[in-house]
Amino acid sequence: MASLAAACRVSARLAARKLQHDAAVRGFRSSAAALAAQNFMMPALSPTMTEGNIASWRVKEGERFSAGDVLLEIETDKATMDVEAQEDGILMKIIQPDGSKGVQVGTRIAVVAEEGDDITKLEIPPDEGPQQLKAAAPAPAPTPAPAPASPQPQFAAPTPSPPKASTKVPARKYPLLPSVHQLIKENGLDESAVSNITPTGPGGRILKGDVLAYLGKINPNTPAQISARFEKASHLDLSNVKVAKPVEPEKPQEEKASAPAPAPRAPEPPAKAVVSLPISLSAVLEAQQRINKKLGIFLPLSTFISRATELANEELPLPTNYQPTADELFDQVLGLDKVPGYVSAAKQRATRGNYVPDIKAPIPPKAAPKPKQKKIDIIDILAAAPKAKSVKPAGPSLVPGAVTEGLNVFSLQVPKTEERRAKVFLERVKHVLENEPGRLVL
């Protein structure tokens, strides 16, 4: 008995190992074997594709293929494209051979089986392509009348009505839209019925409303009314627009003569300020004499003063009412005003002055009365010896109102906002004329 139990355990182990081996060899399947072949339809390689040509089959009948393998080549009016397999399988039978032309999308072109199926025991499924739908389209089954309580009105019979003899449907220039193609397929309309549908879309396109009106599911006049409304709204109608009459401006009421309007007040002139500073020209006279002795060149005082004025007008402070320009505001946004040594062109022009001082000598003190001259006797003149004439040397050329000895008053009359600016100018003129006159020679 012990040996029999041991033998049973060994047999059970061997059976379990055999089952595990078979499962490992066969592998895991997401779907069971169908034991029936499947139709392979003509695919739509683009949204507007309706038919194509089969150039060649890459897989022959009875051959196996894997996911990603190229099954066949399809030619369209635009290009030749490969059709790849989405999963493993077997090509059981080719319905549309190489060189087939005008194969409609959705037509059966082959029969395939799943991997591991025995194709010798499988049956070919019936064709469910659009050809059967076309055959059944000429004789559609009558639809029963709706119940009286139905809220949807029936505008026409649901069966397609033949076109009127007087209505001429234009030839279709564009392919059907995907939504229109799906609606035609669902209602089983063939090509002859589609050619009788009156298009109301832009460029002669067939819309879904045209198909529904042809089938009698909506009012037949609705698509045309909608198309006419869109056509009218696409153009601006100005036929009813009337030009308004120009409105004359109202005349102001005449004012009474007893109360005349006050005269407009003239703007007040800006306040003025007088800035003055005493300056000595002694150092300038000494420099003038040295140049005359050493170089034999005589420079008048006006030259020294004009050069000193030119130097003093450079880089003056800005007026207190100075407004920055647009360029300066933009430079501030960029942070250029904080860059050391950066001065905008507008600020350079603003810091340049154009002052010309007014020079006056101080009023001298009241002169002492001159002694009375002695009465000249004619005898003394005749008896006196003749005197030699003395020639006075030419004196220095002076600026009108300036004196060579003492102090001269340099003054400016400027707006109140430039008072500080004028003081800086006069201080610079004073410094150059009294301390650095030689700087004005070059």
Swiss-Prot record:
Give all N6-lipoyllysine modified positions. 78
Q: Which InterPro entries match?
A: 2-oxoA_DH_lipoyl-BS (IPR003016), Biotin_lipoyl (IPR000089), E2/Pdx1 (IPR045257), E3-bd_dom_sf (IPR036625), PSBD (IPR004167), Single_hybrid_motif (IPR011053)
Cellular location of this protein? Answer: Mitochondrion
UniProt lists compositionally biased (Low complexity) regions at: 152-169
Residue ranges, annotated region (Interaction to the E2 core): 317-336
**Transit peptide boundaries:** 1-35
Which parts of the sequence belong to the Peripheral subunit-binding (PSBD) domain?
175-215
Name the Gene3D superfamilies for this protein.
2.40.50.100, E3-binding domain
Which terms in the GO cellular component ontology are assigned? mitochondrion; pyruvate dehydrogenase complex
Q: Which residues does the UniProt record annotate as the domain Lipoyl-binding? A: 37-113
Q: Site positions for E2-binding in a hydrophobic pocket in the E2 core, renumbered to this chain? A: 330
- Ranges of Basic and acidic residues composition bias in the record: 245-257
Could you state one GO biological process linked to this protein? Answer: pyruvate decarboxylation to acetyl-CoA
What does the domain comment read?
The sequence organization of E3BP is highly similar to E2, having an N-terminal lipoyl-binding domain (LD), a central peripheral subunit binding domain (PSBD), and the C-terminal core region connected by disordered linkers.
Give the family, as the similarity comment puts it: Belongs to the 2-oxoacid dehydrogenase family.
- Briefly, what is this protein's role? The 10-megadalton pyruvate dehydrogenase complex contains multiple copies of three enzymatic components: pyruvate dehydrogenase (E1), dihydrolipoamide acetyltransferase (E2) and lipoamide dehydrogenase (E3) and catalyzes the overall oxidative decarboxylation of pyruvate to form acetyl-CoA and CO(2). E3BP is responsible for tethering E3 in proximity to the core, forming the entire metabolon, and the number of E3s is limited by the number of E3BPs.
What this protein is called in its record is Pyruvate dehydrogenase complex protein X component, mitochondrial
